[in-house]
Amino acid sequence: MNGIHDTGGAHGYGPVYREPNEPVFRYDWEKTVMSLLPALLANANFNLDEFRHSIERMGPAHYLEGTYYEHWLHVFENLLVEKGVLTATEVATGKAASGKTATRVLTPAIVDDSSAPGLLRPGGGFSFFPVGDKVRVLNKNPVGHTRMPRYTRAKWGQWSSTMVCFVTPDTAAHGKGEQPQHVYTVSFTSVELWGQDASSPKDTIRVDLWDDYLEPA
C-alpha cells in the first residue's frame, strides 16, 4: 500500500542521524514488547506479514511520532483485537476478562521450534529469470501489503542473484496462504531510480523482489 511507511526518495524528513552508543532499549517496557513478538508468532496469533501490514495501517502522524517499539505495541493492541484474542476493553483496562485461561504454557523450546523454519520455503516453481537478465518492476499500486518499494516501480534493473523461495508477503498478510515464490536481488543504477540529478550517480542499489513484482525486458 502507498502509505507513510514507504518513504524512500521522499523529501522533507531531514538527515538520518546515527546516535553514538545508542542503547538497545531506552525503557524497560521496550524489553517486554520485544519478547512478546516471538511469543505471539509462536502461538500463531498472527504471522510476520500481518504484523508488518498492521504497522503500515497506522495513522501517518502516529507512525511518524511513535518510536520503534511503540509501533510494535500498536500492533499487539490492535491486531489481537481484530483476531479476537483480546477485547478492546481488556486492552484499555489491562485486565483479562474473567474466566479466561491459557490454552498452553509457552516455553522457550516452543518459540525456538516455531521460528526455526523462518520464511524460507522449498519449491516455488522454476526461476523465471536467468542471472544477468534485464527486468522491469511492474507499475502497480496494491492497496494491501507488499514488499515492492514504491521508488522501484516501473524501473529497469538487472537480476544479480536468486535467493531461492520465500513466503509471498502480499498473500500471507491477507489470509491467502504462503504461496512461495523465488526472490531475486535486482540491481538498479541510482540514475534509473532517481534521475540524472541523483546525488550519487555512480551508486548501485540492490533490492530483493519477488517473482510477481517483475517482468522480463
Curated annotation (Swiss-Prot):
EC category: lyase
Record's keyword annotation contains Electron transport: no
Annotated keywords: Lyase
Gene3D superfamilies from the UniProt entry: 2.30.30.50, Nitrile hydratase, beta subunit (1.10.472.20)
Family annotation (Pfam families): NHase_beta_C, NHase_beta_N
Single GO molecular function: nitrile hydratase activity
Coiled coil: none
Job description of the protein: NHase catalyzes the hydration of various nitrile compounds to the corresponding amides.
Family the UniProt entry places it in: Belongs to the nitrile hydratase subunit beta family.
Name the UniProt record assigns to this protein: Nitrile hydratase subunit beta
Organism this protein belongs to: Pseudomonas putida
Gene field: nthB
